[in-house]
Regions:
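ATP-dependent carboxylate activation and anion-phosphoryl transfer catalytic cores
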Residues: 1-176, 313-316, 321-328, 332-335, ...
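Active-site nucleotide/adenylate-binding loops and adjacent lid/helix of ATP-dependent enzymes
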Residues: 44, 51, 175, 199-360, ...
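Conserved N-proximal alpha/beta basic substrate-recognition cap immediately N-terminal to
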Residues: 110-112, 116-252, 265
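Short polybasic amphipathic segments
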Residues: 188-193, 520-528, 663-670
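Short acidic-glycine loop/turn motifs at beta-strand connectors
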Residues: 194, 309-313, 385, 433, ...
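Extended, charge-rich helix/loop segments that form flexible
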Residues: 336-396
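Phosphate-binding loop of NTP-binding sites
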Residues: 479-619, 623-634, 733
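Acidic, Mg2+-coordinating active-site environments of NTP-dependent enzymes
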Residues: 563, 569, 573-733
Length: 734
């Protein structure tokens, strides 16, 4: 029988923390239809076909907990939603992306499943899931499937949409030290941290990288002159505009020479060890295509090295290797390149490969073609048995030598970066032995590069990977800096808008420029920027990217957590006012039907509380108090009276609480109490008369106290809140 396609009822991209995980995910709702009655062990040949197309599935542990765990589930019989989850993950891994997380859960309707998996980019995730369905259906119906074409297509999406390797290793290091990040573009411009504490990177450039310094480094002649003036060894050279001038300069300098574009990069257009007039003229032609002018330099004998300088220290170094082929008397040069060089797994077309493929018939292969011609060969030539042919002299910087760098060489490299003005620089050094001073080896610095590639240090072919991303993050942030500003998140259905405005006001009075995203609009430092509902992801993110803000307050709802996820990764204070009831929309769209399911949604706010932060919970609601165990930080309860079982138990254990006692709002820590103000105080009484709930007032006090706002300032702020925020008073009245 031919099975009908599994229906994808909805695919949703959750960009921030959600009920499943902290990371961005695809959440798909699917209808298995007749496939609900046909698990994997009920379809002849299904498992063999899936495993044949995707042998990497053996590495998926699944719930079994060990290698081959998912295959065990396949053999025992598992449903197609679960299989689509794992296939989606495997396809992304094959595309070079990361996707370590996934779940598949049946909802209350038979045959309807939620399938969830992590993705680095929405387009990649969506396309992977569509491909997963196609693979599952082909396996079920015993149809052919071109897995290679599918993976190639997904690789192109990943290369285009995901972070490049240099940026990714910095972001990974930031995440490791709990520093949040936001992608500001579809490219590699990334913000590390929030608000006024943020820093920005673009590949291996930072917001400390001077535009002037970058311009200097791209002008190789100017770079050399500045380095020479500071006593740093560089090869002498001349700028030329024609092939004739190139040959004249080569004779003046003395053969052999290096011919390269004045403003080139990545070694493109560079010819080394050129020692004939014909070679110089051909090299000039190749270099002229890559830059505005051409530079002729003295050839320095030795190996090429890349030394990475971050701040004022060397953090990594690699040595280059010459790419060669060995003749067999049968194969052509081009065939030998494909069989002996391009089969190296380190080589590829995508940015994630540390080495490029060598294609003689492409513009990037022109330098290799010239190298071959200098040895009297052509692509179709057949080298004799055992003859070694050099194909590429530069650009293969992939052997780690960090531990070998002589202190004097490191000092020269860091000085070169300072002279040019770069905070992060790739210093290209030619020397016969990097473990000896350059004076002894007659070595020299040949280039200083802004925005250096980091992949060679993260994935060297030989030697130890170096934590260069970590070094860059430590350069941007001090030892005790996380890039975070105080973030307050509020969820519930009882006066959360008013509460968010109260908390933002108190933060403002404490001296922090505070942003607020709530139902009433978007506020930046008490300026009302718009009256449209600003509780969603995009409006909230506007606050986090604003360099002027020292703190931010966010109101959210269960629906927004389910539809988008939260805009921030963690919060200093998480507040839950009550456990909302479900709604027809939540039932129909998300299958949230019970109080336990609603708790799973609301707990997201408390899951995000930082260890140094606090969960502020309404002790008058038992469903809310049960969330206390989920907080990584302190728990601070508030209640209308002290005579609350949860509050009493909490105080007995030395915890903090806020409650009303004999008409006074009271702060308590253990058995110590401080009366803050009386509810009959004129301005406070007016707020309450106008509709502000006592519990909302108590929640605001508790939040402010957890933010270390002084009690006297809390009292003063609440007294004049209504007067200074007339729009809030109007909201309460009407």
């Amino acid at each position: 029988m031919a099975f009908k396609d599994i229906q994808i009822l909805r695919m949703n991209y959750l960009r921030g923390p959600n009920i499943w995980t902290y990371r961005p995910i695809i959440e798909a709702l699917i209808d298995l239809g007749e496939m609900e009655d046909h698990p994997s062990n009920k379809i002849d040949g299904f498992n063999d076909r899936i495993n044949g197309w995707l042998p990497g599935l053996v590495e998926h542990h699944c719930g079994v907990g060990h290698r081959g765990g998912f295959l065990t589930r396949l053999v025992g019989g598992t449903w197609m939603g679960h299989i689509m989850e794992h296939v989606s993950i495997e396809l992304q891994l094959l595309a070079g992306a990361r996707a370590e997380f996934g779940k598949a859960r049946e909802i209350s309707k038979r045959g309807i499943y939620k399938v969830v998996f992590r993705t680095e980019h929405e387009e990649l995730g969506r396309e992977s899931f569509l491909a997963a369905r196609a693979i599952v259906m082909a396996a079920a119906n015993n149809l052919a499937f071109d897995i290679t074409a599918t993976v190639d297509r997904l690789k192109k999406i990943a290369d285009l949409r995901c972070l490049g390797p240099s940026t990714a290793c910095i972001v990974d290091a930031a995440v490791e030290r709990k520093t949040p990040f936001i992608r500001l573009t579809e490219g590699n411009l990334v913000q590390l941290g929030y608000g006024a504490k943020q820093r920005r990177i673009w590949t291996a450039e930072t917001d400390r990288t001077s535009a002037i310094a970058e311009s200097i480094s791209s002008d190789k002649d100017l770079t050399k002159r500045l380095l020479t003036q500071c006593g740093i060894p560089v090869p002498e050279g001349q700028i030329v505009k024609t092939a004739d001038e190139a040959w004249e300069a080569a004779q003046d300098i003395g053969l052999p020479v290096v011919v390269k574009p004045l403003d080139g990069n990545r070694g493109w257009g560079v010819s080394l060890d050129v020692n004939t007039e014909e070679g110089v003229r051909a090299a000039w032609t190749a270099a002229e295509k890559e830059g505005s002018e051409v530079l002729i330099e003295r050839y320095v004998r030795g190996d090429e090295h890349r030394v990475l300088v971050v701040g004022d220290r060397v953090v990594a170094a690699t040595r280059g290797e010459t790419a060669c082929i060995t003749g067999d008397g049968i194969s052509t040069v081009e065939q030998l390149i494909d069989s002996q060089i391009n089969t190296d797994p380190r080589r590829g077309l995508a940015e994630g490969f540390p080495l490029d493929l060598i294609r003689l018939n492409t513009p990037r292969g022109e330098m290799s073609l010239l190298e071959i011609q200098r040895q009297g060969l052509k692509p179709e030539s057949i080298p004799t048995q055992g003859r070694i042919v050099v194909v590429q002299r530069n650009g293969n910087l992939n052997n780690d030598v960090t531990d070998w760098v002589h202190p004097d060489v490191a000092a020269v490299a860091t000085l070169a970066a300072r002279v040019i003005g770069l905070d992060i620089a790739g210093i290209d050094i030619v020397t016969q032995d990097i473990s000896r001073p350059l004076e002894e080896t007659k070595g020299a610095i040949i280039e200083v590069n802004a925005g250096p590639g980091l992949l060679m240090h993260v994935k060297p072919a030989v030697g130890q990977p170096r934590p260069v991303g970590k070094a860059i993050v430590e350069h941007l942030f001090g030892p005790n800096e996380s890039g975070r500003i105080p973030v307050v998140g509020i969820v519930g259905s009882q006066q959360t808008t008013e509460l968010s405005q109260l908390v933002a006001w108190l933060l403002h009075l404490s001296g922090k420029r505070t942003g607020l995203a709530c139902k009433d609009g978007l506020y930046m430092d008490q300026q009302h920027l718009g009256k449209s509902d600003s509780r969603g992801f995009e409006a909230s993110e506007r606050l986090l990217i604003n360099r002027a803000l020292d703190a931010a307050v966010f109101e959210t709802t269960p629906a927004l957590i389910l539809d988008e996820g939260l805009a921030y990764d963690r919060c200093l204070v998480g507040i839950v006012t009550n456990m909302p009831d479900t709604t027809p929309t939540l039932i129909d769209k998300h299958d949230i039907q019970t109080s336990d399911q609603m708790r799973t949604v609301v707990r997201t706010q408390i899951d995000l509380v930082l260890p140094e932060g606090a969960a502020v919970l309404n002790a008058d609601e038992q469903a809310v108090t049960s969330l206390a165990e989920l907080s990584d930080g302190e728990v601070l309860f508030y209640a209308k009276t002290k005579d609350n079982a949860t509050m009493l138990t909490h105080l007995q254990s030395g915890g903090r609480g806020v409650y009303c006692k004999e008409g006074h709002v009271t702060l308590a820590r253990g058995d110590q109490e401080t009366q803050l103000f009386h509810l009959d105080l004129e301005l406070i009484a007016r707020l309450l008369k106008n509709g502000l709930h006592i519990s909302t007032l108590l929640a605001a006090v508790a939040a402010a106290w957890s933010l270390d706002i002084a009690p006297l300032l809390i009292r003063a702020g609440l007294k004049n809140f209504g007067q200074q925020n007339q729009h809030v008073a109007h909201t309460l009245q009407g």
